[in-house]
Amino acid sequence: MTDKRKDGSGKLLYCSFCGKSQHEVRKLIAGPSVYICDECVDLCNDIIREEIKEVAPHRERSALPTPHEIRHHLDDYVIGQEQAKKVLAVAVYNHYKRLRNGDTSNGVELGKSNILLIGPTGSGKTLLAETLARLLDVPFTMADATTLTEAGYVGEDVENIIQKLLQKCDYDVQKAQRGIVYIDEIDKISRKSDNPSITRDVSGEGVQQALLKLIEGTVAAVPPQGGRKHPQQEFLQVDTSKILFICGGAFAGLDKVISHRVETGSGIGFGATVKAKSDKASEGELLAQVEPEDLIKFGLIPEFIGRLPVVATLNELSEEALIQILKEPKNALTKQYQALFSLEGAELEFRDEALDAIAKKAMARKTGARGLRSIVEAALLDTMYDLPSMEDVEKVVIDESVIAGQSKPLLIYGKPEAQQASGE
Protein backbone atom coordinates (compact mmCIF):
# COMPACT_ATOMS: atom_id res chain seq x y z
CA MET A 1 0.00 0.00 0.00
CA THR A 2 1.12 3.58 -0.59
CA ASP A 3 0.40 6.91 1.02
CA LYS A 4 -1.50 9.05 -1.50
CA ARG A 5 -2.85 12.55 -1.37
CA LYS A 6 -4.13 12.69 -4.97
CA ASP A 7 -4.44 10.19 -7.75
CA GLY A 8 -2.70 10.66 -11.08
CA SER A 9 -5.47 12.92 -12.41
CA GLY A 10 -5.17 15.34 -9.49
CA LYS A 11 -8.66 14.42 -8.24
CA LEU A 12 -9.42 14.92 -4.52
CA LEU A 13 -9.32 11.61 -2.59
CA TYR A 14 -11.58 10.45 0.25
CA CYS A 15 -11.34 7.75 2.94
CA SER A 16 -13.51 4.81 1.85
CA PHE A 17 -14.58 4.18 5.49
CA CYS A 18 -15.32 7.54 7.12
CA GLY A 19 -15.64 9.71 3.99
CA LYS A 20 -13.16 12.39 5.12
CA SER A 21 -11.16 14.10 2.40
CA GLN A 22 -7.38 14.01 2.17
CA HIS A 23 -7.28 17.56 3.59
CA GLU A 24 -9.08 16.53 6.81
CA VAL A 25 -6.66 13.76 7.80
CA ARG A 26 -2.90 13.41 8.23
CA LYS A 27 -2.44 10.24 6.15
CA LEU A 28 -4.45 8.53 3.44
CA ILE A 29 -3.33 5.01 2.58
CA ALA A 30 -4.27 3.62 -0.82
CA GLY A 31 -5.18 0.04 -1.68
CA PRO A 32 -6.71 -1.48 -4.81
CA SER A 33 -9.48 1.05 -5.55
CA VAL A 34 -9.94 1.88 -1.82
CA TYR A 35 -8.46 4.38 0.65
CA ILE A 36 -8.21 4.41 4.45
CA CYS A 37 -7.17 7.33 6.66
CA ASP A 38 -4.93 7.23 9.77
CA GLU A 39 -7.91 7.90 12.05
CA CYS A 40 -9.75 4.80 10.81
CA VAL A 41 -6.57 2.72 11.24
CA ASP A 42 -6.38 3.85 14.89
CA LEU A 43 -10.07 3.05 15.37
CA CYS A 44 -9.57 -0.46 13.96
CA ASN A 45 -6.63 -1.02 16.31
CA ASP A 46 -8.78 0.05 19.29
CA ILE A 47 -11.57 -2.36 18.28
CA ILE A 48 -9.10 -5.25 17.98
CA ARG A 49 -7.55 -4.43 21.37
CA GLU A 50 -10.98 -4.41 23.03
CA GLU A 51 -11.85 -7.78 21.49
CA ILE A 52 -8.57 -9.25 22.76
CA LYS A 53 -9.37 -7.98 26.28
CA GLU A 54 -12.81 -9.64 26.12
CA VAL A 55 -11.35 -12.96 24.94
CA ALA A 56 -8.55 -13.00 27.56
CA PRO A 57 -10.78 -13.76 30.60
CA HIS A 58 -12.23 -16.82 28.80
CA ARG A 59 -8.72 -18.12 28.21
CA GLU A 60 -7.90 -17.57 31.89
CA ARG A 61 -11.01 -19.45 32.97
CA SER A 62 -10.10 -22.57 31.05
CA ALA A 63 -6.54 -22.44 32.38
CA LEU A 64 -7.38 -22.48 36.11
CA PRO A 65 -5.11 -25.14 37.64
CA THR A 66 -6.51 -27.69 40.10
CA PRO A 67 -5.37 -27.76 43.76
CA HIS A 68 -3.13 -30.74 42.93
CA GLU A 69 -1.48 -28.79 40.10
CA ILE A 70 -1.03 -25.71 42.30
CA ARG A 71 0.56 -27.83 45.04
CA HIS A 72 2.86 -29.55 42.51
CA HIS A 73 4.02 -26.16 41.18
CA LEU A 74 4.72 -24.90 44.71
CA ASP A 75 6.81 -28.04 45.33
CA ASP A 76 9.14 -26.95 42.49
CA TYR A 77 10.06 -23.74 44.31
CA VAL A 78 9.29 -24.17 48.02
CA ILE A 79 10.80 -26.89 50.19
CA GLY A 80 8.72 -28.39 53.02
CA GLN A 81 5.63 -26.68 54.48
CA GLU A 82 3.38 -29.43 53.07
CA GLN A 83 0.25 -28.55 55.07
CA ALA A 84 0.57 -24.83 54.26
CA LYS A 85 0.88 -25.64 50.54
CA LYS A 86 -2.26 -27.76 50.65
CA VAL A 87 -4.24 -25.05 52.48
CA LEU A 88 -3.03 -22.39 50.03
CA ALA A 89 -3.78 -24.55 46.97
CA VAL A 90 -7.39 -25.10 48.02
CA ALA A 91 -7.96 -21.47 49.08
CA VAL A 92 -6.50 -20.03 45.87
CA TYR A 93 -8.42 -22.49 43.69
CA ASN A 94 -11.70 -21.63 45.45
CA HIS A 95 -11.02 -17.89 45.16
CA TYR A 96 -10.47 -17.95 41.39
CA LYS A 97 -13.32 -20.44 40.88
CA ARG A 98 -15.52 -17.89 42.66
CA LEU A 99 -14.35 -15.15 40.28
CA ARG A 100 -14.89 -17.37 37.27
CA ASN A 101 -18.48 -18.25 38.20
CA GLY A 102 -19.50 -14.97 39.81
CA ASP A 103 -20.09 -14.32 43.49
CA THR A 104 -23.06 -16.67 43.62
CA SER A 105 -23.60 -20.30 42.65
CA ASN A 106 -27.18 -21.66 42.53
CA GLY A 107 -28.29 -18.69 44.60
CA VAL A 108 -25.66 -19.29 47.30
CA GLU A 109 -23.34 -16.35 47.91
CA LEU A 110 -19.67 -17.39 47.90
CA GLY A 111 -17.44 -15.66 50.46
CA LYS A 112 -13.86 -14.51 50.00
CA SER A 113 -11.01 -16.82 50.96
CA ASN A 114 -8.41 -14.33 52.19
CA ILE A 115 -5.44 -16.05 53.82
CA LEU A 116 -3.36 -15.54 56.97
CA LEU A 117 0.12 -17.11 56.96
CA ILE A 118 1.76 -17.60 60.36
CA GLY A 119 5.38 -18.68 60.54
CA PRO A 120 8.88 -17.64 61.61
CA THR A 121 11.16 -15.39 59.56
CA GLY A 122 12.58 -17.09 56.50
CA SER A 123 10.08 -19.97 56.46
CA GLY A 124 8.78 -19.18 52.95
CA LYS A 125 5.67 -17.01 53.45
CA THR A 126 6.59 -14.39 50.83
CA LEU A 127 7.94 -16.99 48.41
CA LEU A 128 4.68 -18.95 48.53
CA ALA A 129 2.65 -15.83 47.67
CA GLU A 130 5.03 -14.81 44.84
CA THR A 131 5.05 -18.33 43.38
CA LEU A 132 1.24 -18.48 43.38
CA ALA A 133 0.97 -15.17 41.50
CA ARG A 134 3.55 -16.32 38.95
CA LEU A 135 1.73 -19.62 38.36
CA LEU A 136 -1.65 -17.93 37.90
CA ASP A 137 -0.15 -15.11 35.80
CA VAL A 138 -1.91 -12.41 37.83
CA PRO A 139 -0.58 -9.04 39.06
CA PHE A 140 1.18 -9.25 42.43
CA THR A 141 2.27 -6.60 44.88
CA MET A 142 3.70 -6.58 48.39
CA ALA A 143 3.08 -4.15 51.21
CA ASP A 144 4.75 -3.77 54.58
CA ALA A 145 2.16 -3.37 57.34
CA THR A 146 4.65 -1.46 59.52
CA THR A 147 4.62 1.48 57.06
CA LEU A 148 0.83 1.80 57.03
CA THR A 149 -1.13 4.34 59.06
CA GLU A 150 -4.69 5.58 59.17
CA ALA A 151 -5.63 8.13 56.52
CA GLY A 152 -4.65 11.65 57.56
CA TYR A 153 -1.56 10.61 59.53
CA VAL A 154 2.08 10.59 58.45
CA GLY A 155 2.74 7.28 56.71
CA GLU A 156 1.28 5.23 53.90
CA ASP A 157 -2.49 5.00 53.43
CA VAL A 158 -3.95 1.53 52.91
CA GLU A 159 -5.34 2.67 49.53
CA ASN A 160 -1.74 2.98 48.31
CA ILE A 161 -1.61 -0.83 48.25
CA ILE A 162 -4.19 -0.87 45.45
CA GLN A 163 -2.31 1.85 43.59
CA LYS A 164 0.84 -0.31 43.67
CA LEU A 165 -1.16 -3.23 42.27
CA LEU A 166 -2.46 -1.03 39.45
CA GLN A 167 1.08 0.08 38.63
CA LYS A 168 2.09 -3.58 38.23
CA CYS A 169 -0.49 -4.07 35.46
CA ASP A 170 -0.15 -0.68 33.75
CA TYR A 171 -3.36 0.67 35.36
CA ASP A 172 -5.56 -2.03 33.79
CA VAL A 173 -8.39 -2.18 36.35
CA GLN A 174 -9.74 -5.54 35.13
CA LYS A 175 -6.33 -7.17 35.54
CA ALA A 176 -5.76 -5.57 38.95
CA GLN A 177 -9.08 -6.97 40.19
CA ARG A 178 -7.75 -10.50 39.59
CA GLY A 179 -4.48 -9.79 41.41
CA ILE A 180 -2.88 -10.96 44.64
CA VAL A 181 -1.79 -8.61 47.44
CA TYR A 182 0.65 -9.84 50.08
CA ILE A 183 0.78 -7.78 53.28
CA ASP A 184 3.88 -8.67 55.29
CA GLU A 185 4.57 -8.06 59.00
CA ILE A 186 0.85 -8.11 59.74
CA ASP A 187 1.63 -9.11 63.34
CA LYS A 188 3.33 -5.74 63.87
CA ILE A 189 -0.02 -3.91 63.70
CA SER A 190 -1.46 -5.77 66.68
CA ARG A 191 -2.89 -3.51 69.35
CA LYS A 192 -0.92 -3.07 72.52
CA SER A 193 -3.39 -5.06 74.65
CA ASP A 194 -6.39 -7.26 73.95
CA ASN A 195 -8.68 -4.70 75.62
CA PRO A 196 -10.14 -1.88 73.48
CA SER A 197 -8.17 1.31 73.99
CA ILE A 198 -9.59 4.79 74.44
CA THR A 199 -6.41 6.34 73.01
CA ARG A 200 -5.64 6.59 69.30
CA ASP A 201 -3.43 3.79 67.93
CA VAL A 202 -2.83 4.98 64.35
CA SER A 203 -0.26 2.34 63.42
CA GLY A 204 -1.84 -0.63 65.22
CA GLU A 205 -5.57 -1.08 65.73
CA GLY A 206 -6.19 1.95 63.51
CA VAL A 207 -4.53 0.23 60.55
CA GLN A 208 -6.50 -2.95 61.20
CA GLN A 209 -9.71 -0.90 61.05
CA ALA A 210 -8.55 0.78 57.83
CA LEU A 211 -7.71 -2.58 56.23
CA LEU A 212 -11.06 -4.16 57.12
CA LYS A 213 -13.12 -2.86 54.20
CA LEU A 214 -10.25 -3.16 51.74
CA ILE A 215 -9.73 -6.85 52.52
CA GLU A 216 -13.43 -7.72 52.77
CA GLY A 217 -14.32 -5.94 49.55
CA THR A 218 -15.02 -2.33 48.69
CA VAL A 219 -14.76 -0.04 45.70
CA ALA A 220 -11.52 1.86 46.21
CA ALA A 221 -11.05 5.18 44.43
CA VAL A 222 -7.48 5.34 43.16
CA PRO A 223 -5.96 8.30 41.30
CA PRO A 224 -5.01 7.43 37.70
CA GLN A 225 -1.44 7.37 36.42
CA GLY A 226 0.05 10.81 37.03
CA GLY A 227 -3.03 11.69 39.09
CA ARG A 228 -1.31 14.42 41.10
CA LYS A 229 -0.12 16.13 37.93
CA HIS A 230 -3.63 16.01 36.45
CA PRO A 231 -6.02 16.46 39.40
CA GLN A 232 -8.97 17.01 37.06
CA GLN A 233 -8.87 13.36 35.91
CA GLU A 234 -11.49 10.99 37.31
CA PHE A 235 -10.39 8.42 39.91
CA LEU A 236 -10.19 4.76 38.93
CA GLN A 237 -12.76 2.56 40.69
CA VAL A 238 -11.27 -0.78 41.81
CA ASP A 239 -13.46 -3.53 43.29
CA THR A 240 -11.30 -5.15 45.98
CA SER A 241 -13.78 -8.00 46.58
CA LYS A 242 -12.13 -9.78 43.64
CA ILE A 243 -8.56 -9.29 44.89
CA LEU A 244 -6.99 -12.09 46.94
CA PHE A 245 -5.32 -10.76 50.09
CA ILE A 246 -2.64 -12.85 51.79
CA CYS A 247 -1.37 -11.54 55.13
CA GLY A 248 1.77 -12.92 56.73
CA GLY A 249 3.72 -12.50 59.93
CA ALA A 250 6.09 -14.22 62.34
CA PHE A 251 3.75 -13.66 65.34
CA ALA A 252 6.59 -13.98 67.85
CA GLY A 253 5.13 -15.00 71.21
CA LEU A 254 1.90 -16.45 69.78
CA ASP A 255 3.10 -19.94 70.69
CA LYS A 256 3.13 -18.89 74.36
CA VAL A 257 -0.47 -17.64 74.09
CA ILE A 258 -1.54 -20.97 72.54
CA SER A 259 0.46 -22.95 75.10
CA HIS A 260 -1.24 -21.11 77.96
CA ARG A 261 -4.69 -21.84 76.49
CA VAL A 262 -3.90 -25.50 75.84
CA GLU A 263 -2.43 -26.06 79.31
CA THR A 264 -5.23 -24.15 81.05
CA GLY A 265 -7.84 -26.14 79.16
CA SER A 266 -6.28 -29.49 80.02
CA GLY A 267 -7.84 -29.45 83.49
CA ILE A 268 -6.58 -29.18 87.05
CA GLY A 269 -6.81 -31.31 90.17
CA PHE A 270 -6.67 -35.09 90.52
CA GLY A 271 -8.20 -35.75 87.09
CA ALA A 272 -5.75 -33.53 85.18
CA THR A 273 -3.20 -35.03 82.83
CA VAL A 274 0.27 -34.18 84.10
CA LYS A 275 2.74 -33.42 81.30
CA ALA A 276 6.45 -33.84 81.71
CA LYS A 277 8.75 -31.09 80.44
CA SER A 278 9.89 -33.41 77.66
CA ASP A 279 6.26 -33.68 76.46
CA LYS A 280 5.99 -29.96 75.73
CA ALA A 281 5.02 -29.26 72.12
CA SER A 282 7.39 -27.50 69.76
CA GLU A 283 6.64 -24.01 68.47
CA GLY A 284 5.47 -25.40 65.12
CA GLU A 285 3.12 -27.90 66.79
CA LEU A 286 1.65 -25.15 68.95
CA LEU A 287 1.13 -22.75 66.03
CA ALA A 288 -0.75 -25.51 64.18
CA GLN A 289 -3.33 -25.40 67.03
CA VAL A 290 -3.99 -21.66 66.66
CA GLU A 291 -7.56 -20.49 67.24
CA PRO A 292 -9.17 -17.07 66.63
CA GLU A 293 -9.18 -16.41 70.40
CA ASP A 294 -5.37 -16.76 70.43
CA LEU A 295 -5.02 -14.15 67.69
CA ILE A 296 -7.36 -11.82 69.60
CA LYS A 297 -5.21 -12.20 72.73
CA PHE A 298 -2.15 -11.49 70.56
CA GLY A 299 -3.66 -8.16 69.50
CA LEU A 300 -5.67 -8.61 66.30
CA ILE A 301 -9.23 -7.32 66.49
CA PRO A 302 -12.05 -9.89 65.99
CA GLU A 303 -13.39 -8.14 62.87
CA PHE A 304 -9.97 -8.31 61.22
CA ILE A 305 -9.55 -12.02 62.01
CA GLY A 306 -13.01 -12.63 60.53
CA ARG A 307 -11.82 -11.23 57.19
CA LEU A 308 -9.00 -13.84 57.08
CA PRO A 309 -10.91 -17.14 57.29
CA VAL A 310 -8.11 -19.33 55.92
CA VAL A 311 -5.16 -19.76 58.30
CA ALA A 312 -2.00 -21.67 57.33
CA THR A 313 0.93 -22.16 59.68
CA LEU A 314 4.53 -22.68 58.57
CA ASN A 315 7.18 -24.52 60.56
CA GLU A 316 10.67 -23.30 61.30
CA LEU A 317 12.97 -24.82 58.69
CA SER A 318 15.30 -27.58 59.85
CA GLU A 319 18.96 -27.85 58.88
CA GLU A 320 18.09 -30.61 56.39
CA ALA A 321 15.40 -28.42 54.80
CA LEU A 322 17.88 -25.53 54.42
CA ILE A 323 20.31 -27.86 52.61
CA GLN A 324 17.47 -28.91 50.28
CA ILE A 325 16.60 -25.25 49.66
CA LEU A 326 20.22 -24.60 48.66
CA LYS A 327 20.25 -27.19 45.89
CA GLU A 328 16.82 -28.61 44.95
CA PRO A 329 14.31 -25.91 43.84
CA LYS A 330 14.28 -24.75 40.22
CA ASN A 331 15.73 -21.41 41.27
CA ALA A 332 17.92 -22.82 44.08
CA LEU A 333 20.60 -20.47 45.41
CA THR A 334 23.50 -22.68 44.31
CA LYS A 335 22.02 -22.88 40.79
CA GLN A 336 21.77 -19.08 40.64
CA TYR A 337 25.44 -18.60 41.54
CA GLN A 338 26.51 -21.40 39.19
CA ALA A 339 24.68 -19.58 36.38
CA LEU A 340 26.49 -16.33 37.30
CA PHE A 341 29.90 -18.04 37.24
CA SER A 342 29.12 -19.79 33.94
CA LEU A 343 28.71 -16.34 32.36
CA GLU A 344 32.40 -15.82 33.22
CA GLY A 345 33.27 -19.19 31.67
CA ALA A 346 33.90 -20.91 35.02
CA GLU A 347 32.21 -23.84 36.73
CA LEU A 348 31.21 -23.39 40.38
CA GLU A 349 31.13 -26.43 42.65
CA PHE A 350 29.74 -26.55 46.20
CA ARG A 351 30.95 -29.56 48.14
CA ASP A 352 28.47 -31.26 50.48
CA GLU A 353 30.32 -30.14 53.60
CA ALA A 354 30.06 -26.53 52.36
CA LEU A 355 26.27 -26.83 52.09
CA ASP A 356 26.16 -28.29 55.62
CA ALA A 357 28.23 -25.36 56.92
CA ILE A 358 25.96 -22.80 55.21
CA ALA A 359 22.85 -24.41 56.73
CA LYS A 360 24.43 -24.55 60.22
CA LYS A 361 25.36 -20.86 59.99
CA ALA A 362 21.81 -19.90 58.96
CA MET A 363 20.36 -21.96 61.83
CA ALA A 364 22.65 -20.18 64.29
CA ARG A 365 21.52 -16.79 62.98
CA LYS A 366 17.84 -17.84 63.21
CA THR A 367 17.12 -16.16 59.86
CA GLY A 368 15.77 -19.24 58.05
CA ALA A 369 16.09 -19.44 54.27
CA ARG A 370 16.36 -15.65 54.07
CA GLY A 371 19.85 -15.73 55.59
CA LEU A 372 21.29 -18.24 53.11
CA ARG A 373 22.05 -15.71 50.37
CA SER A 374 24.04 -13.37 52.63
CA ILE A 375 26.22 -16.30 53.81
CA VAL A 376 26.95 -17.48 50.25
CA GLU A 377 27.48 -13.91 49.05
CA ALA A 378 30.08 -13.26 51.77
CA ALA A 379 31.93 -16.48 50.92
CA LEU A 380 32.06 -15.69 47.19
CA LEU A 381 32.57 -11.91 47.31
CA ASP A 382 36.34 -11.82 46.70
CA THR A 383 36.13 -14.45 43.96
CA MET A 384 33.32 -12.61 42.15
CA TYR A 385 35.38 -9.41 42.43
CA ASP A 386 38.55 -10.95 40.95
CA LEU A 387 37.17 -13.48 38.46
CA PRO A 388 36.27 -11.05 35.62
CA SER A 389 39.90 -9.84 35.61
CA MET A 390 41.41 -13.35 35.69
CA GLU A 391 42.13 -15.64 32.77
CA ASP A 392 41.88 -19.39 32.28
CA VAL A 393 39.92 -20.15 35.49
CA GLU A 394 37.93 -23.26 34.64
CA LYS A 395 36.50 -24.17 38.02
CA VAL A 396 35.89 -22.68 41.48
CA VAL A 397 35.44 -25.11 44.39
CA ILE A 398 33.78 -24.14 47.70
CA ASP A 399 34.34 -26.30 50.77
CA GLU A 400 33.59 -26.00 54.49
CA SER A 401 36.69 -23.91 55.28
CA VAL A 402 35.62 -21.24 52.76
CA ILE A 403 32.23 -20.85 54.47
CA ALA A 404 33.99 -20.65 57.86
CA GLY A 405 36.24 -17.87 56.49
CA GLN A 406 39.40 -19.92 57.07
CA SER A 407 40.50 -20.19 53.44
CA LYS A 408 39.80 -18.89 49.95
CA PRO A 409 37.95 -20.88 47.26
CA LEU A 410 40.05 -23.36 45.28
CA LEU A 411 40.64 -22.09 41.72
CA ILE A 412 41.36 -24.66 39.00
CA TYR A 413 43.01 -23.26 35.88
CA GLY A 414 43.00 -24.56 32.32
CA LYS A 415 46.12 -26.38 31.06
CA PRO A 416 48.74 -24.09 29.45
CA GLU A 417 49.39 -26.66 26.70
CA ALA A 418 45.75 -26.46 25.66
CA GLN A 419 46.02 -22.67 25.47
CA GLN A 420 49.15 -22.83 23.30
CA ALA A 421 47.55 -25.41 21.00
CA SER A 422 44.50 -23.22 20.55
CA GLY A 423 46.76 -20.23 19.90
CA GLU A 424 48.54 -22.10 17.10
From Swiss-Prot:
Keywords: ATP-binding, Chaperone, Metal-binding, Nucleotide-binding, Zinc. ATP binds at P120, T121, G122, S123, G124, K125, T126, L127. Residues 2-56 form the ClpX-type ZB domain. It comes from the Bacteria. Disulfide bonds: none annotated. The keyword Transport does not apply. SMART domains: AAA (SM00382), ClpB_D2-small (SM01086), zf-C4_ClpX (SM00994). This is ATP-dependent Clp protease ATP-binding subunit ClpX. It comes from Klebsiella pneumoniae subsp. pneumoniae (strain ATCC 700721 / MGH 78578).
